[in-house]
């Protein structure tokens, strides 16, 4: 993720130095490449964490279904971003895949009650749904807000899990 943030900064600095407009499509491409790498890992962590809390295992077919839906969600979003399809189609298609992906996770790992699972599941679901809300915001604001969402969904979740498993934080 840090590599892609470096590319964002280079793009912004280049536009400023050359007094040319920022290439938002290029920035979106960087963002979606980053997400294509990081989101499957984040979803694996979510599934492993939730399975561990209910003494279950993560079936490969379940994880692969979640990852395929994740890539479908990203594909719809990206195609809407770069104008291959309209944004509404990108948003609706992305949210359908998002809903199915989270339904699989919910049905698989929320069958037994676990407060910790509920907290993390709903945290992920709400934060990730905010990306869809920000989808219609102007490009400059969207980059800034998605950077904040990335910070929350990547860094803070990682820190929270570390704190939980080291028993510094009990849920």
Q: How would you name each of these model-derived features?
A:
Residues 1-33, 39-171:
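Polytopic alpha-helical membrane-helix bundles and their juxtamembrane interface segments
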């Amino acid at each position: 993720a840090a590599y892609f943030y470096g590319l964002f900064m280079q793009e912004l600095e280049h536009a400023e130095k050359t007094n040319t407009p920022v290439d938002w499509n290029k920035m979106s491409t960087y963002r979606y490449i980053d997400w294509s790498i990081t989101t499957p890992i984040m979803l694996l962590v979510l599934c492993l964490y939730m399975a561990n809390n209910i003494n279950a295992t993560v079936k490969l077919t379940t994880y692969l279904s979640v990852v395929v839906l994740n890539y479908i969600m990203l594909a719809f979003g990206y195609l809407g971003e770069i104008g291959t399809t309209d944004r509404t189609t990108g948003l609706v298609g992305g949210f359908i895949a998002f809903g199915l992906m989270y339904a699989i996770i919910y049905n698989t790992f929320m069958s037994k009650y676990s407060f910790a699972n509920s907290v993390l599941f709903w945290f992920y679901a709400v934060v990730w749904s905010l990306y869809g809300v920000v989808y219609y915001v102007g490009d400059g604001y969207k980059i800034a807000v998605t950077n904040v969402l990335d910070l929350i969904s990547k860094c803070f979740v990682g820190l929270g899990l570390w704190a939980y498993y080291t028993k510094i934080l009990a849920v």
